[in-house]
Amino acid sequence: MNASPQRRDAFYALQTESAKLAPIQDVKTRWNSTFLMLRRAKRLRPYFTPFCDEYERSDLALDDDEWRQIEYLLWITQPFFEFTLELSKTKDATTHHVFKIYNKLFEHLEQSITQLRRKRVPWKTNMLQALEAAQQKLKDYYAETDDIRGDLYAIGTMLAPTNKLRFFQTDEWEEQWAQRYRRSFQDYLIPYKARLGSTQTSLPYQSSKRSGSRLDMMLGSQQPDNLSRDKLS
């Protein structure tokens, strides 16, 4: 279609009651391009079959089972899309959100993997392998936060008034991590304490009146689902 203006116009002509849209191609180097491609495909679903019929390419038309796979892939990738979108829009510091975002994504993948392990349909079995690979890749990226000198991600997390040290004192964290991050935080404050002690200057307290961002809302509660939770029944 992209190589043929005539075919593109023919595809547009099928869209009589909506804006004229073309499919989006996945681009490996572009963030969220897979999600955007699938979302556009779902929107254009009514036009693909008649377009394929017109050019006698029924072999390229997706069946109901393949559309079901697209629905599920959209559900899987939506949280990644939402977090990427919000992080790219914000102009504020986001270091204190890193662990929360990872936790949300791990939880999402784990729930999906647990559901898929009960399935025996071939495409769901293949999807399980893909999700397990995605989970491992996310673990690899998460492990890199430990390599940052001085545990800066943890310190940034504790500096957020809504987190403090108690963020690392929940059942999700082993006690050793809270102890380690507490020591790192204390070490981080040493030069500032010395500087403050030499000046003896008190800074006026200023309360923040800012309302929470959408990113705060996403991390503070269960992320809203625009797609059905159960895509595997």
Over which residues does each language-model region extend?
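Surface-exposed, charged/polar loop-rich segments
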Residues: M1-N32, L36, K42-T49, E132
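Hydrophobic positions within alpha-helical membrane elements
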Residues: M37-L38, L165
